[in-house]
Amino acid sequence: MIFEITSRKEWMSILDSVDTYDVYHTYDYHHLSLEEFDRPILMVYVENDIVVGIPLIIRPIPDTDLFDATSVYGYPGPVSAGITLNFDASKMAKQVHSFLRENNIVSVFSRLNPYIPHQSLILGELGSVNIAGPIVGIDLTLNMTQQRERFSRRLKTQLNKAERNMIVREGSGIEDITLFHEIYTESMDRLNAVDRYYFPLPYFIDLFDSDQINAKLLLAECKTTGEIMAGSIFTISKEIVQYHLSGTYDEFLDAMPSKLLIDHMRKYCSNKNFLHLNLGGGLGSNTDGLFRFKKSFSPSLRSFTLWSYIVNKKAYKKLVKKHKAENLSDNLLFPEYRS
């Protein structure tokens, strides 16, 4: 049986019934930054003791009566209970395909979560799952000494210096949230970030208002002047802690305060039954300077993967043909008909 859920209570009831989930699967996170006409759903498959939930955002395709599905920013993908290595993905795939066709959904794209088990197995008969690049995680099952032993030598030196010059405090209230928004926006401007990496102030206010997301803001403060140098937002779920967003004022870049913030969160999360502190990867999943910055904390890498599924091939080809006729350059992203 397959059905969709759109209510907050029922959505969280399904999440509470699965083996594990991340903040990127919650109802509240799916309602943070919707575009006009976007509709978040949790597509649920149930068979005997098996439960699979796939969170999606359904979007209308302009100038048509068709739709496609995408995922939130972050690491969502399927969550499940009762899945074993003998799981028959083909049975679920038939029902998912029928559900999507009945709802005029042409294609599905979703980022996946490398810390949630069985995602590739569940999606094995539905389109393709491709590796986008590596991400870095700190193993929180190790004790703090073992974790620090995996730091690069240079990072240890930088942290020692940072601890002498800065203090870390937890941000709270609208003033600190507004301050972080300012720091983050300045950082995105410096990096010439594309629009999708910018978030308005109400996004951050709603983020911290949610009891499902459980966000924590850490701020690095200069010991001598009291100036705030940088801020980082972490999200906390059942087993997974995420390094969600971070920013540093331009004038303090050389001091690398964000490294101290990550280390502070690492210490906070240790010995609390969390399994992973995910630092993410490089910009656009590349092994760039951002990736190397994160890798200095841990050699533990996992593959960040993307799920793509063409539900209605005829409609998809027609949309791609129309897009190419109206645009000078090809779109290498999925789906190809979106610019």
Show the residue positions of the predicted features.
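A gly/proline- and charged-residue-enriched helix-loop-helix capping module
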Residues: T70-P117
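Active-site/acyl-donor-binding loops of N-acyltransferases
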Residues: L42, P60, L121-T145, K272-S339
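A conserved beta-strand-loop-helix scaffold within acyl/acetyltransferase catalytic domains
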Residues: I2-N48, G53-D63, L112-D254
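Short, high-confidence coil segments that cap the C-terminus of an alpha-helix
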Residues: D38-P40, E102-I105, K272-F274
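A short, internal acetyl-CoA/4′-phosphopantetheine-binding micro-motif in the GNAT/acyltransferase core
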Residues: G74-N86, T141-L142, S246-A255, L283
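Aromatic (often tryptophan-rich) hydrophobic motifs at membrane interfaces
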Residues: V44, K94-H97, Y203-K318
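Conserved acyl-donor/pantetheine-binding loop and adjacent beta-alpha core of acyl/acetyltransferases
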Residues: R59-Y75
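A short, structural micro-pattern
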Residues: I50, V72, N104, V129-A132, ...
